[in-house]
Amino acid sequence: VVLLFGAAVLRFHLAWWRGHLGDLLVFQSWAVGTDRMKWFREVQHLGNFFPNYPPLYPSLCRLLVWIHEAAALPGDIRLPIDDMTLEESRPIILLFKTPPIAADLAAAVIIFLWGRHERRPGLGLLVAAFYLFSPAILYDGAYYGQTDTILLALLIGSGFAYATRRPVLLGSSAMLAALLKAQAISVLPILAAAVIIEWRHVWQRRFAELFLGAALSFWAVLALAGLTGMLHLFYNGYFTIVGQYSRTSYNALNLWWIIHSPLDRRPNLADFPADSLRVAGLVTYRDIGLALFAAALALTIWRWRRAADRPASLVLACAASAWAFFNLCTEMHERYSVVAVGFTCLAALWERKWFAFGLLSSLTTMINITLACHFWYPPCRWLQFHLNWFLHADSPGPFLAISAIQVLMLPLVLDALWRTGSRGRTPAVNAR
């Protein structure tokens, strides 16, 4: 309780400051409606930023607006979040940062329960604290105000439900993850394959409960989307997102950054070509990225199928898949490695070396995120300046170094998955 309280206080303190006002304004426009916002002429361009999420999060944002209006909470919900309105908008900024903060706390509770299930309650508490104060987790949710840590919490919940044989929770949390962000594809195929692989031994007789959990979440989100007018996002959130940020890398320090970054100057977005361009007139960069991700995913599933240490190897497989998604696919944003960082930190529950690698990858991800969301922190200008050091780099060296670390996380996790040993055909974890 003390740990959760301290983590919550720190998060709300960070949330009070600027964050990414552009993304928060977009969330606000989805929730309120551009035509209902003040300064309509100044914000009508946001109509071009139609919701490109599945229905869960935009519906939740609109629900937050209704709660704010009904409860007469502080702040003008219709005043656009902007630099000029920053002081007046702080209560609204806090409002839109509350979901990721709540998700972080929930994920920590799940990690602690997972540790207790593994008969490692002390280590579970330590890993939960490690997760809560992980730089990338803190920065992406509480400061930036983005949704990646919400997705991460749902995926960790799905992994916990799988490992502890809770079919209703597994179906429910996996469905919520899919309805939150299309980027859930970074991990959900691993969990789906795991269910199929252990179908006869474990999940066949629990299919009704698994289906019930998924159905409950789906119908709840469907009802919420209908209530909030977001039903069209069942299409927009999945079928309009590919190509919207058509570059090989969109601030993501990954394999594509290394390939296309200039070596004689600081790189910028214009250096990264559209991923729809064809290589040698045959296939597009996007096709190559998807093929590489599919190959890495298939390799990970094949290896996990024979892994001996099922709880630990499942987490490593999820981490490997998430790192493959971030490093190999095109159109990646800087924060899409947050899911990979979370599972890397979680792996410390079984092997303590992941404390070091989890911290390293969390720091590189946080630094990567500052490319898009600079740290603004008036209480300590020294911290603000040094956390933004990456922005002042004139040469490509620091960018390439961080890219290399993040790319190398994939073979590192795959190697650890290989070292978990092999088993026979009998599942390592019996059904309970």
Placement of each model-derived feature along the sequence:
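Specific aromatic-rich, kink-prone transmembrane helix
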Residues: 110-113, 134-137, 150-169, 343-344
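Perimembrane helix-loop-helix junctions
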Residues: 187-216, 226-227, 339
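Transmembrane helical bundles and short interhelical boundary loops of multi-pass, membrane-embedded
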Residues: 223, 227-250, 302, 318, ...
